[in-house]
Design a protein with these regions (language model features):
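Short glycine/acidic-rich loop motifs that flank beta-strands on beta-rich extracellular proteins
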Residues: 51-56, 80-81, 124-130, 150-154, ...
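Acidic Gly/Asp/Thr-rich repetitive segments characteristic of extracellular carbohydrate-active
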Residues: 11-68, 103-104
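The right-handed parallel beta-helix/beta-solenoid scaffold, focusing on the short coil/turn
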Residues: 5, 42, 53, 65-67, ...
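Ser/Thr/Gly-rich low-complexity blocks that favor extended beta-strand/coil architectures
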Residues: 122-124, 148, 173-225, 366-403
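Surface-exposed loop/turn segments connecting beta-strands in extracellular beta-rich domains
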Residues: 53-54, 78-79, 110, 118, ...
Length: 579
């Protein structure tokens, strides 16, 4: 409690019966550490090795004397067998919320902490949340690299294609078996037939990657092992094998995330790496002031892998304050590297003049604490996506996991229509993404749906499989809110991305240029090296400015629908010229 004490953990030489106060008498597990209440200036020194329990420190430092947790250089293996397991509702990941999830690092109700590594590699085994922050404040992670010994995505390279068969080389990390003439992927606590979702990667084309649905294994009639990680696959007709390509295999059941940040603030990742993330990457939910600075979301150099994330890399749902992603490498995601949005809840009832019953509509997002008293909400037309009233929450009552009753300070509007929705507008963040590089990406680059200022500057997008930037807003499909009011896309380089490269596509069914969904979007001084002729598509925007850009096409590469206040000027077109 008094602080200033140093504790030592060494799983190879330690003993939990030791005092843990000297390097020569360390503890062997995290159990004694987890039993402490750490204070200002306390430090925990951890040596490499294998752990079977969660690191779960408690206590509080101060801004001047934070708690320090230091990992020495080396390999750390975290196994889920004795880990803390929690039932969690995680945005966009809720296919199985009632099975408790194992957690490797849990920072809960803790303040002012510095976690540092020095060439430190953290390997998790099985489906585990690598790092969770729950009601944490002022925590900085530095110098840690996270990975899996057995990733949740399996890979093989097509070595040769001949008449009636193909020879493939399976990545050594992708353990497998051949059972009853079928190939089965074997993980730590899971197995898969490899037919849920496949992606194909072409290393000779800058790692360009695209989705293939169920993939080629469904067309294989027989499998024959020809070496430790070499398999000959027989077919009557080639189901899509091309020599030199890498095929990636994963399931689509969303039951985990690599990281989870809930009701936390001032969390910083600096000089870290995520070489593989299971599930939805790092999901930040109703948290604020989050920074990712010089973080590599990419396969470990020299590993031979092409995948670093099972789905999104960074997912922000219902956050506020300032989100900063700077100088990050984002390579090898199976979904969007960055997604920022709120959640529309459908109005399903009005039991009293000051009350409304709301429902989570998407099957992968529910059970979340979406409102607290004092939050401001907007009533939104599901057809036009236009807000028509605001109010303030005074009370919240959960009605199971999928419905919530909120009481409001003022009477509800009289003109609510069936299927209209509500957005919590207190929890909307500003976003800055600078000097990042996106590659080996089958989906969009960045999805941005927030009314606070957005700056996308000096990034490189290389051959994204879908639009490099998507600004959406919808109340009928994913129910991801909301409108943008101040977006600057400046100084970026887009190289042969799928088109439209910048796609402003709200899902409003009633379209009126006098009633736009989005406002004030500036696309300035960017370079568009296009594969075709469509750089920008914009729907339902008031105040769209496209100036100073370089387009590698002589056609006008801007398409607008129901927009007003459009300025397209001073752009340079043709043969890759730069403005």
């Amino acid at each position: 409690v008094n602080g200033g004490t140093v504790y030592f953990v060494d799983p190879r030489t330690g003993d939990d019966a030791n005092a843990g106060l000297t390097p020569g008498k360390p503890w062997c597990s995290f159990r004694p550490v987890n039993a402490l209440r750490l204070g200002p200036g306390d430090r925990v020194e951890i040596r490499p090795g294998t752990f079977h329990e969660t690191l779960m420190p408690m206590g509080a430092g101060t801004a001047g004397k934070p708690i320090e947790i230091r990992f020495a250089s080396g390999d750390y293996d975290f196994h889920p067998d004795n880990a803390v397991r929690l039932k969690l509702h995680i945005s966009n990941s809720n296919d199985d919320p009632y099975t408790p999830k194992a957690v490797a690092f849990l920072f809960q109700d803790i303040r002012h902490v510095r976690i540092t590594g020095n060439r430190t590699d953290i390997y998790v085994h099985g489906k585990m949340i690598q790092t969770m922050f729950d009601h944490a404040e002022d925590v900085v992670l530095t110098g840690l690299a996270f990975d899996y010994r057995r990733p949740l995505v399996s890979e093989f390279t097509v070595v040769k294609v001949a008449e009636g068969h193909a020879d493939v080389r399976i990545h050594p990390d992708s353990t497998y078996a051949i059972e009853n003439d079928r190939l089965v992927w074997l993980g730590e606590g899971w197995r898969s037939a490899g037919t849920d979702l496949n992606q194909e990667c072409d290393p000779s084309d800058d790692g360009r990657v695209w989705r293939r649905g169920s993939g080629p294994l469904t067309g294989v009639t027989r499998f024959e092992r020809t070496g430790p990680f070499e398999v000959r696959m027989f077919f009557d007709q080639n189901p899509g094998f091309t020599a030199g390509r890498v095929i990636q295999f994963r399931e689509t059941f969303r039951d985990c995330a690599a990281g989870f940040v809930r009701r936390s603030r001032n969390i910083v990742w600096r000089d870290c790496a995520y070489h593989f993330m299971g599930g939805m990457g790092i999901v930040s939910q109703f948290s604020e002031d989050l920074t990712f600075d010089h973080v590599a979301f990419a396969p470990r150099p020299g590993s031979g892998r092409t995948t670093s994330s099972w789905a999104d890399m960074l997912h922000f749902s219902g956050c506020r304050g300032r989100i900063v992603v700077a100088d990050c490498e984002m390579s090898g995601s199976h979904d969007d590297p960055i997604n920022v949005h709120g959640t529309h809840l459908r109005i399903t009832g009005q039991p009293a003049s000051h009350q409304i019953l709301l429902r989570f509509m998407h099957g992968q997002t529910y059970g979340i604490e979406a409102f607290v008293p004092g939050d401001e909400v907007e009533f939104v037309s599901h057809l036009s996506l236009r807000a028509y009233a605001t109010n303030v929450v005074t009370a919240v009552e959960a009605k199971g996991d999928k419905e919530v009753l909120i009481t409001l300070a003022s009477p509800c509007p009289a003109d609510i229509e069936a299927n209209d929705v509500v957005e919590n507008i207190t929890w909307t963040p500003s976003v800055e993404v600078r000097n990042c590089r996106v590659s080996v990406d089958s989906c969009r680059g960045f999805l941005l749906s927030t009314r606070q200022p957005v700056l996308i500057e000096n990034n490189v997008f290389l051959k994204t499989g879908m639009s490099a930037i998507l600004i959406a807003d919808d109340a009928n499909s994913w129910f991801e809110s909301g409108p943008v009011r101040d977006v600057m896309i400046r100084g970026n380089t887009f190289i042969k991305c799928s088109e439209p490269v910048v796609n402003i596509a709200p899902e409003n069914h009633t379209v009126n240029p006098d009633a736009p969904v989005h406002r004030n979007i500036r696309i300035m001084n960017n370079t568009f090296d296009l594969a075709g002729d469509m750089a920008i598509s914009a729907k339902s925007v008031h105040g769209l400015t496209v100036t100073g850009n370089g387009f590698s096409t002589r056609k006008l590469p801007v398409h607008t629908v129901a927009c007003a206040g459009v300025v397209i000027a001073d752009n340079v077109q043709g043969d890759g010229q730069h403005p």
